[in-house]
Amino acid sequence: MRWREATTPTPADPGLADLTPDRRLRRLELTVTRRLDGLLHGQYRGLLPGPGSEPAGSREYRPGEDEVRRMDWAVTARTTVPHVREVDADRELTTWLLVDASPSMEYGTAELDKRELAVAAVAAVGFLTAGLGNRLGAQVLGPDGLRRHPARSGRTHLLGLLRTLLAAPRAGGYDETDVPPAGPDLADALDAVHRVATRRGLVVVVSDFLDGLPDDPAQEPPWERALRRLAVRHQVLAVEITDPRELELPDVGLITLVDPETGRRREVWTGDERLRERYAAAAAAQREQVRQAVRRSGATHLPLRTDRDWGADIVRHVRAQRRLAAAPAGANRGGAA
């Protein structure tokens, strides 16, 4: 379900879009620093539960305590006793970001649009993982293809990446006659990250995860297998970006909906209560489809909405993950839903 209202909504902060990229960057840095104050000096593992990322031998598997995905199959085969890989926290962490900048992210009816919220999430991840020589790289998926930013350390590199994301031209606005040819999709982008992220670390995927969702919820999305492959090697955080108008339609009469990927248009009478109910039910089923796919892949799920306090949501997530990381062995250590 990628239909969007044809009219461009007015953001809650109309001055933001009029600022230069450098001024927007300074405002974003200040906002992230204020909202995440007290967490910025924590260890990177606060983003996700569990151990670090450097191998440190193997030990016998303890049912109920260990994650099956850390099974050391080579040692298990050699000893005929199940073993898991032990890992120690890295002195230096490499984080890879996959940022979805496809046309479906160019939408918003609340405090931020989806693209701006995605950049805020990238900034939060960058500042939370910065320091001690940690490196940050990115793959940006846009309508013109996949653009790679090599992994480097330092605040200057992070700010340069954020400046690039803020200054990138807006995608979408097509009609059915000028849609560009199809480029890489989310599954392709995940595979690209898998190829460049050769050292075990942290992978953060920021997307609405709408790409290729099948109509049949029993079918897995085309990107699920690639996400699962990443989660075998890395700790993976899936940041899902949504807008309230993607979840329910207001009763505002006749509107024109536009598919931002194809330019297709459809007029809809929102005064039809049954139509609004069907829309809301379909949208809820779609979000559940994404949630289940992320869970099955082994990634941690962090949903963010344009109409919520994203800073508070990230803080709650980080604190919950730190509690999980500090829980004694044998306690319930399930990831965030």
Short names for language-model regions:
Residues 1-51, 57-71, 75, 84-120, ...:
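Exposed, interaction-prone extracellular/peripheral surfaces
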